[in-house]
Amino acid sequence: AALCTLEAKNEKFPLYKDAKVPMEKRVEDLLSRMTMEEKVLQLSQYVAGRNTNANNIGEEVKNIPAEIGALLYYSTSPGLRNNIQKKAMEESRLGIPVLFGHDVIHGFRTVYPISIAQACSWNPTLVEKACGMAAREARLAGLDWTFSPVIVVARDPRWGRVSEGYGEDPYTNGVFAAASVKGYQGDNLADGKHIAACLKHYIGYGASEAGRDYVYT
């Protein structure tokens, strides 16, 4: 009887939800429970928050699958974010929370110089501090993740996204990208003051031809 009670308790509170268990074991347990469809949805991203009509917020939440992994989030509404997260936690089979991401590239509420101008400072320590402040502002707005820094080695000034990177020198790109990641993520992503970074874009993206975006890369 005691064994049955213990098994029933474990079923209600699975290992992957136990914060005292090492992260690797929690991830392994969670993955073992997931269906292929759930794994695919965790690798998918929807867009939310562009519809600012209050009457349509419910419709927007309804159209987002409860099992979605992440959102490109444009809203500043705590209500919309909380409703989406509530749906993910309560209506999905495994209760996996959603990651809310946004392009926090050169500041969030406080706007700093664009990345190529940051590189002109030759001051990665200052850039780290700026990214740290941007992370804090973004986290307070309910974001977990930024699609930054942009690491593109500029090869053609006609390309419209040159300004998003740190110039034409690979070493400079590396130094400032590292500083940015340190600023965004800090030493502890769970401290409520930092967000996850995302190095982008895919390898070779900056090697555009004739300045055209996406065409050959």
Residue map of PLM features:
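Glycoside hydrolase catalytic-domain context in secreted enzymes
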Residues: A2-T217
